[in-house]
């Protein structure tokens, strides 16, 4: 798990986010900081208690669809891929692979359980100078063709 996390203003600077209580907003930031490299948090209730948030704050994040709750109690940050992009040499896949297998990804990089493309890490994990794994393979093929 990294020590640095990013936040995308297109998610944070919305009425849906800013109209939530400050305690709920703070919980969202704390959950993001403690998430693994795929955006999963295995102990959201412990984090709630640790930071002084209530379970109502957690329920509000679920209701407003900022986080997705799985049956086993694990959560994932819905907009994780919008917020963060990791290089392949720093990326460590989540331990929650069964939950991850249920996810799809929308065109805007938000996780979903419904409609979307199957999750393909090669498109979202960066290699080197801001290239994804897929982009690197494409560029390599172009170089070989020439």
Language model: regions and residue ranges:
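Short, amphipathic alpha-helical interface elements at domain boundaries
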Residues: 2-38
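Short N-terminal amphipathic alpha-helix/helix-capping patch enriched in small hydrophobics
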Residues: 23-27, 43, 57
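Winged-helix/helix-turn-helix nucleic-acid-interaction surface
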Residues: 1-11, 16, 51-146
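Short acidic, hydrophobic short linear motifs in intrinsically disordered regions
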Residues: 35-51
């Amino acid at each position: 798990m990294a020590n640095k996390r990013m936040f995308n203003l297109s998610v944070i600077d919305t009425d849906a986010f800013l109209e939530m209580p400050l305690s709920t907003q703070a919980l969202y930031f704390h959950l993001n900081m403690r998430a693994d490299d795929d955006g999963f948090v295995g102990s959201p209730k412990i984090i709630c208690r640790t930071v002084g948030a209530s379970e109502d704050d957690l329920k509000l994040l679920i209701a407003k669809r900022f986080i997705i709750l799985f049956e086993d109690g694990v959560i994932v940050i819905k907009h994780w891929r919008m917020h963060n992009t990791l290089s392949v040499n720093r990326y460590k896949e989540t331990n929650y692979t069964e939950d991850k297998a249920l996810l799809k990804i929308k065109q805007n990089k938000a996780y979903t359980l419904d409609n979307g493309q199957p999750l393909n890490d090669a498109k979202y994990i960066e290699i080197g100078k801001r290239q994804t794994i897929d982009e690197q393979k494409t560029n390599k093929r172009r170089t070989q063709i020439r």
